[in-house]
């Protein structure tokens, strides 16, 4: 077998690059301070730190309320725009859903969905409720979902109809799991949900859009992401 040859590594000055970097590492490193980062954060009224507040509420509470925060484009060409105000309202509703299901600070809420708007609403809403969010790749089979859910002790799973059916065989093994929320976007899946499951849409419709974010701190867990 012929031996592969590779061109030698070339060390270039940023000024000699065809596409110049936005920042110089040495300059950025020398000028960085955590204190300056803290100054850019809004913080919770009680001095805590919460990702959902920093990503959504701080903007929704000010001049950016009607500015588009998220654009979703579906596989079939659909498009939905969500302002910061929309995201605050929806995530407040989901935070209330979490509390109605008994979720307390530090409890695990896992999300097994395609990249639908409901995924982001559930993620940030659960963070507002003080939960630790576990994202699950939608291409996972039953075993990776089971392993992560069992290890984490997740109490709530948010998923969609086809993915719920894919993992139906492992649900009895998840002894800590208390609730499954099924998000059936626009009613696209005609099959009824299982009797023990809850409709994401129905729970959201019942939930208030007024919520005070749970006081979380910068050293509290917020995301539980498994890698292989």
Regions flagged by a language model, labelled:
Residues 1-82, 86-99, 173-176, 186-192, ...:
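N-lobe entry segment of adenylate-forming
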Residues 2-14, 124, 128-202:
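Structural core segment of the AMP-binding/adenylate-forming
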Residues 113-115, 160-161, 220:
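Helix N-cap/beta->alpha junction signal
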Residues 66-68, 182, 192, 196-197, ...:
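Conserved pre-ATP/AMP-binding loop-to-beta segment of ANL
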Residues 87, 109, 126, 157, ...:
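Conserved S/T- and glycine-rich ATP-binding loop of Class I adenylate-forming
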Residues 66-124, 141-146, 199-202:
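Conserved AMP-binding/adenylate-forming core of the ANL superfamily
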């Amino acid at each position: 077998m012929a031996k592969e040859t590779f061109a030698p590594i070339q060390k270039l000055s940023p000024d000699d690059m065809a596409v110049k970097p936005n920042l110089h590492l040495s300059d950025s490193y020398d000028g960085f301070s955590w204190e300056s980062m803290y100054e850019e954060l809004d913080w919770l009224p009680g001095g805590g730190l919460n990702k959902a507040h920093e990503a959504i509420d701080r903007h929704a509470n000010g001049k950016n309320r009607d500015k588009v925060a998220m654009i979703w484009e579906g596989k079939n060409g659909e498009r939905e725009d969500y302002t910061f105000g929309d995201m605050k309202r929806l995530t407040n509703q989901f935070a209330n859903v979490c509390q109605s299901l008994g979720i307390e600070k530090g409890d695990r809420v896992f999300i097994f969905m395609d990249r639908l708007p409901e995924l982001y609403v559930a993620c940030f809403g659960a963070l507002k409720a003080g939960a630790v969010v576990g994202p699950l790749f939608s291409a996972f089979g039953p075993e990776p979902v089971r392993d992560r859910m069992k290890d984490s002790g997740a109490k709530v799973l948010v998923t969609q109809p086809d993915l719920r059916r894919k993992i139906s065989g492992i649900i009895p093994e998840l002894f800590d799991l208390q609730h499954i929320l099924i998000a059936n976007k626009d009613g696209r899946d005609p099959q009824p949900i299982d009797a023990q499951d809850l409709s994401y849409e129905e729970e959201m419709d019942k939930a208030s859009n007024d919520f005070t974010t749970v006081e979380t701190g910068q050293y509290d867990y917020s995301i539980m992401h498994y890698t292989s």
